[in-house]
Amino acid sequence: MFTDKINLALKIAAKVHQGQNRKGTDIPYISHPVAVGMIISQYTNDETTIVAGILHDILEDVNPGIYSEADMRRDFGDEITDIVKDVSEPKTAGQPKLLWKERKKSYLKRLGSSYYIETYFVVAADKIHNLTDILKDYDQFSNEIWHRFNASKWDILQYHRAVFNLIRKEPVPIELKRHLAALIEKLGDIVAINP
């Protein structure tokens, strides 16, 4: 599916993520939001959900002086912006960044209270892509990949399990849930082998 709104989301995401790379790599960051949108499109052709997937990291990772929540509301409306907010870690201007566990706890709380079913599609696709990359990189670099993160591999596994426990209760396609569950299980196998 390709629409004017999806095209606009791709253009804005490419512009605002310019110069950013995937964690611990030289891969341009735009590959992630595009992949999330593509994963979502395997399970639904809902334009709102696909656009939210493409935009999902902007409010969390982009300086509001470059592209703000108000810009997103203007360009994409309240529903898409609210979905993106629901999948974003909270930012507090002028405050130091919270520790990894505190950020994830806050994220899970926000996610658990989301009004939009689309939120869970976006989160599942985001985690599917992140875990796919982690597992592929693990195959190539082994335990070296864990140095990229501000958390232990055990904490990363537990976090993904907690996210899945929220998603599995929601009316999203069983195939999407199974895809995510299989990746979490593979991560669990790695953590069990190399504690």
What are these regions (language model features)?
Residues 1-195:
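Active-site helical microenvironments for divalent-metal-assisted chemistry
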